Design a protein with these regions (language model features):
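Active-site phosphate-binding/coordination module
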Residues: 2-61
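Enzymes and membrane/adaptor proteins characterized by extended Gly/Ser/Thr/Asp/Glu-rich
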Residues: 94-102
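Active-site core segments that coordinate phosphate-bearing ligands/cofactors
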Residues: 32, 39-51, 57, 62-95, ...
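A conserved helix-loop-beta module that forms one wall/lid of the active-site cleft
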Residues: 118, 124-139
Length: 280
């Protein structure tokens, strides 16, 4: 079996393998202003040139910097850093490892080296020893622990897929050539291509394209675009008010029945990332 999840979110474990503190979702506002605060020590142009990862306010590097500011005791007590799918794999197998495609989204992995960038980690003031060896998708982690095996009644080998769900989605596209353009749509829409080498030029940085790690050491060169998050949020809010959520076809029909909106909305604006009310 293999597990994939969204990217950027993580857990910290103590020396006994127990979670330290809360696991915080990436839409939390704790990273506000972190990039600007880090700019003197780590200019974003340098950060991008080394990692190839686009600016997003919720990048793992910024989450860890925010944690260092708010709860330095948690970071000091940490022995292990795991992304969300890494942690689930750890619970199943007892093996602590960081899978490459998800690790690449942290903005802590060198685009060329495909390994942890010690200089970036040092400039952020993070403990290097918490980061585990990076494992490539396709490798086997191992069998279930005895505890899991007894609980489920069978054994199973846990394999590493591209544990970033977009990496697995791109891998599933039945493209036959190197010029294919991919669009993976869900809460986010990810539009891009696969490249054999990262593109970390100043022009790429200015356009805020990202180079996420892919299967067989390839790079998913793409743009993050607002996906279904806005309509998902509106649907949830309407359901909370009415007691039952409208269907997506009902929402689309209601929107089509309205008069044209005279303005243009930039759906990529940060105010839509985690508003208290998407409707308002």
């Amino acid at each position: 079996m293999g597990i994939d999840t969204w990217a950027v979110d993580f857990v910290l474990l103590d020396g006994q393998g127990q979670i330290i503190g809360d696991t915080v979702a990436y839409r939390d506002g704790r990273t506000a202003g972190i990039r600007e605060a880090l700019e003197p020590a780590l200019p974003f142009a340098e950060h991008y040139a080394r990692t190839g990862i686009q600016y997003q306010p919720f990048n793992t590097a910024y989450q860890l910097a925010a944690l260092k500011n708010e709860h330095p005791d948690q970071l000091a007590a940490a022995k292990t850093f795991l992304m969300v799918p890494d942690y689930l794999n750890f619970k199943l197998t007892g093996v602590a490892a960081n899978e490459y495609t998800n690790a690449s989204t942290t903005a802590l992995v060198g685009a060329e080296s495909q390994d942890w960038d010690d200089e970036i980690i040092s400039k952020l003031g993070l403990p290097r020893e918490i980061f585990q060896p990076i494992r490539m998708p396709g490798q086997a982690l191992g069998p279930f622990t005895a505890e899991i095996r007894d609980a489920v009644g069978f054994d199973c080998t846990v394999l590493l897929p591209a544990t970033h769900d977009t990496g697995s989605a791109f891998l599933a596209v039945p493209a036959r050539d190197d010029k294919a353009v991919y669009l993976s749509s869900g809460t986010w829409s990810l539009l891009g291509v696969e490249n054999p080498q990262p593109i970390t030029t100043p022009e790429s940085c200015a356009a805020n394209f990202t180079n996420e790690g892919g299967y067989e050491s390839r790079y998913r060169y793409l743009k993050n675009i607002m996906g279904l998050w806005m309509i998902q949020s509106v649907r949830r809010e309407l359901g909370e008010k009415a007691g039952a959520r409208p269907t997506f076809p009902e929402l689309i029909a209601a929107a089509q029945a309205c008069s044209d909106f005279p303005g243009v909305v930039s759906t990529g604006d940060d105010r839509f990332l985690a508003p208290k009310s998407m409707i308002e």
